[in-house]
Amino acid sequence: MMKPLMAIALCGLAASGWAQATSPVLHGAEPASVAVNDDDWRVEIVPPFALPSREPGYHGGAVVERPRAVLLFMGEGWAGARVSEVHSAFIADMPGLGSLTRYGVRAHPSVHVQRGTIWTPENGFAHHGGLTDLEIQAQLERIPSGPSAKDTVYVLFLPESHSAFLGEKVGGADFLAYHNQFGSRHGGQLRYVVVPYRHDAGQLAQAAVRSFVQAVVNPDGTGWY
């Protein structure tokens, strides 16, 4: 009896490993542009170094055709002037529509960016110096679903007191931003970008825009990358 059970177990492990290895999510992507969250899901990151230049390829997945960016500044420490500085830099760094239409983006006349707001975590929220991706998703569940939710990408800027964790990777040291999505209780996919804190507003916005564009052209991990 032991041998059949062992064979079944080995087959199960092999099947699981095969499924992970052949998952269409970010399959064939540059390894340095991928991290794994605490739910064993691969996500696309902006690494803290330049990647080899290569033309993105299309993998058959969805694109956010009429994207809207909603900037959220989490927690304390975000003065109004600082928020305005990052907001302005984000708009200035956004690629023109001409460079996005080739990927199927149809925003007109440009990508809409909603004025940044300060966002306070729920009462009793505790952290351990950083946030995992699943903890961030739990906080984002509190956002009411708007009429353009399917086209909305929330861009979450973390405070200096919070880091972000993707498995063993730490925000700032191992990645400058990342994007992901999850099935919201409000229905549909809630798409978001997470941007760990940086003192330079220009560099902060630049990393945010890079990840936002990735979230638009590659929301499911099967689009352009």
Task: Set out the residue ranges of the language-model regions.
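Positively charged n-region of N-terminal signal peptides that target proteins for export
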Residues: 1-4
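Bacterial N-terminal signal peptides
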Residues: 6-15
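Sec/Tat signal peptide C-region and signal peptidase I cleavage site
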Residues: 17-19
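N-terminal carbohydrate-binding/catalytic regions of secreted carbohydrate-active enzymes
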Residues: 22-138
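Hydrophobic, Leu/Ile/Phe/Ala-enriched alpha-helical segments that form helix-helix packing faces
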Residues: 87-95, 139-147, 212, 216
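Long, well-ordered early-domain segments
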Residues: 127-157
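Active-site-proximal segment of zinc-dependent metalloprotease catalytic domains
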Residues: 145-219
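Post-HEXXH active-site segment of zinc metalloproteases
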Residues: 221-225
